[in-house]
Curated annotation (Swiss-Prot):
BP GO terms, sorted: DNA recombination; DNA repair
Subunit structure: Homohexamer. Forms an RuvA(8)-RuvB(12)-Holliday junction (HJ) complex. HJ DNA is sandwiched between 2 RuvA tetramers; dsDNA enters through RuvA and exits via RuvB. An RuvB hexamer assembles on each DNA strand where it exits the tetramer. Each RuvB hexamer is contacted by two RuvA subunits (via domain III) on 2 adjacent RuvB subunits; this complex drives branch migration. In the full resolvosome a probable DNA-RuvA(4)-RuvB(12)-RuvC(2) complex forms which resolves the HJ.
InterPro entries linked: AAA+_ATPase (IPR003593), AAA_lid_4 (IPR041445), DNA_helicase_Holl-junc_RuvB (IPR004605), P-loop_NTPase (IPR027417), RuvB-like_N (IPR008824), RuvB_C (IPR008823), WH-like_DNA-bd_sf (IPR036388), WH_DNA-bd_sf (IPR036390)
Keyword Nucleotide-binding: yes
SUPFAM superfamilies for the chain: P-loop containing nucleoside triphosphate hydrolases, Winged helix' DNA-binding domain
Binding site for DNA: 309, 314
The protein's name: Holliday junction branch migration complex subunit RuvB
Region Small ATPAse domain (RuvB-S), annotated ranges: 182-252
Native source organism of the sequence: Nitratiruptor sp. (strain SB155-2)
Region (Large ATPase domain (RuvB-L)) location: 1-181
The keyword ATP-binding is annotated on this UniProt entry: yes
EC number(s) reported in the record: 3.6.4.-
């Protein structure tokens, strides 16, 4: 069953997100430092008539990596080709993509940490020298054919920057870590989205949704979509705070943005009485895979101080005990 606060994209959300996606810097709310730096770099490249350096975006899912890439392409007046690492299985897959690029094009590779070492090897000269090296044959008779490529910009996006190999990471001229959004930023995103949907929303209602969106625009827009359903069924022209609170309660999202799975995880850590729990232990107890816990559930909890991740495992924090209304174990070294 899909969680309403899931940060990964639902299969039916692509068209909805596309409708609400900002198309320029003025529309894009948040990530101000990244925006301001990119504006300068893009302006400088256009002034010199150069292609933009390769860009790496990393951070938790749902924070706008794809949207930023689309805006970069728009600002550079460039075509953008979008793919994902799992779709590039063979060297021929990457070669086909690279040889179809034109001068100044942007290639966006999502989940770039999932590229195989063999594919990375092909990407190195393409990124550095705009050259594709194709090996024909094997053994002593093998020959390397070098094909010149047009100058292009590679934008890589990943939720797991630590899994990128050093040679690949070093070939990106710009590295940007996306941060969680503030409730105020999310409230503005929600208000703008509601306007695009021709639906009025009270400022208090937008902020209420924002506070429960785990700092993530994708979740904020999903919650807005569901709250709008409740409002429309009630024949209300405006989404009110009262309707929003009732809708979010019905959806099982509390005032912190936690759902049942979050609370189960925190309760599990609190019940450990100060003993660190390993990722595999937590995954087994929650019937979730380790990757989902590490990449999807934990980032928000870590960023907001609801759990501590140490070399020995995960531990509850004082905030965890407070929200669960439990007394912390006095032997817990955190206290």
């Amino acid at each position: 069953m899909e969680r309403i606060v899931e940060v990964e994209k639902f299969s039916e959300e692509s068209s909805f997100e596309t409708t609400l996606r900002p198309s320029d810097w003025d529309e894009y709310i948040g990530q101000e430092k990244i925006k301001n730096n990119l504006k300068v770099f893009i302006q400088a490249c256009k002034k010199r008539g150069e292609t933009l350096d390769h860009v790496l975006f990393f951070g938790p899912p749902g924070l706008g990596k794809t949207t930023l890439s689309l805006i970069i392409a728009s600002q550079m007046e460039a075509n953008i080709k979008i793919t994902a690492a799992p779709m590039i299985e063979k060297s021929g897959d990457l070669a086909a993509i690279l040889t179809n690029l034109e001068e100044g094009d942007i290639l966006f590779i999502d989940e770039i940490h999932r590229l195989s070492p063999a594919i990375e090897e092909i990407l190195y000269p393409a990124m550095e020298d705009f050259r594709l090296d194709i090996i024909i044959g094997s053994g002593p008779a093998a020959q390397t054919i070098k094909i010149d490529l047009p100058k292009f910009t590679l934008i890589g996006a990943t939720t797991r920057a630590g899994m990128l190999s050093s040679p690949l990471r070093d070939r990106f001229g710009m590295h940007f870590r996306l941060q969680f959004y503030t409730p105020q930023e999310l409230a503005q995103i929600i208000t703008n989205a509601a306007n695009k949907l021709s639906k009025d929303i009270d400022a208090e209602a937008a902020l209420e949704i924002a506070k429960r969106s785990r700092g993530t625009p994708r979740i904020a827009l999903r919650l807005l979509k569901r709250v709008r359903d409740f409002s429309d069924v009630a024949d209300e022209k405006t989404i009110t705070l009262k309707r929003t609170q009732k809708a979010l309660e019905a959806l099982g999202v509390d005032e912190r943005g936690f759902d049942e799975l979050d609370l189960k995880l925190l309760k599990l850590l609190a019940d450990a009485k100060g003993k660190p729990l390993g990722l595999s232990t937590i995954a087994a107890a929650l019937s979730e895979d380790e990757g989902t816990i590490e990449d999807v559930i934990e980032p928000f909890l870590l960023a907001n101080g609801y759990l501590e991740r140490t070399a020995r495992g995960r531990m509850a924090t004082l905030k965890t005990y407070e929200i669960l209304k439990l007394t912390p174990n006095i032997q817990n070294s955190l206290f």
